[in-house]
Amino acid sequence: MSNTDAQTSFASLVVGPPVTDPINPLMGATSISPNLIELHGRKALVFAFGNLAVRAEGDFVLRYRVADILAGTGIDGVFPIQAICYGGPFHVFSTKDFPGYEASTELTKTLSVWGAQVNVREHRRRRRGKKDAAPAVTKPLYTTAPLDRDIVADSERRRRRRAGY
């Protein structure tokens, strides 16, 4: 069995048939340098993708490849691959179904202390349900009367609060 066949077989076992869609659902930095950290008294090289996002809803497995860019010639931007591994399966929710953020793990907090650019959350942030949402201001689409300044200011405050300002 060739290396490519083994990779395809592994991906098939985890999430079904391999994705053949040529559209890349990833957004952000897909190529990074490692961070040297100390975790549980041991030093480790960790590759933390702090700003990587998936644009599509569904179940995914990421493939990680390590290349030594100093060892290769880089002809046509291709460097020899030193190692390949796969991450665990994960689910990307639609905006409507997203349950909220979990509190950061100890690993994430350690990465932040050692200089990796990751988001750290002390507490779980749940998504507000419709009962908790601020009431919407209802008004006709077209009006000849001047807008009430209090309603405009109140809706502006709510918009900024939702946007995180």
UniProtKB/Swiss-Prot annotation:
Query: Which InterPro entries does the record match to this protein?
Result: Velvet, Velvet_dom, Velvet_dom_sf
Q: Where in the cell is it found?
A: Nucleus
Q: Which GO BP terms sit in this record?
A: sporulation resulting in formation of a cellular spore
Q: What is its main location?
A: nucleus
Q: Does the keyword Transcription apply?
A: yes
Q: Which residues form the Velvet domain?
A: 1-121
Provide a GO CC annotation, any one.
Answer: nucleus
**Pfam families assigned:** Velvet
Q: Which UniProt keywords apply?
A: Nucleus, Sporulation, Transcription, Transcription regulation
Gene induction? Expression is up-regulated during fruiting body formation.
Task performed by this protein: Velvet-domain-containing protein that probably acts as a positive regulator of sexual development.
Q: Which family does it belong to?
A: Belongs to the velvet family.
Q: What is this protein called?
A: Probable velvet family sexual development regulator CC1G_12219
| Organism from which the protein derives | Coprinopsis cinerea (strain Okayama-7 / 130 / ATCC MYA-4618 / FGSC 9003)
Write the lineage as a comma-separated list.
Eukaryota, Fungi, Dikarya, Basidiomycota, Agaricomycotina
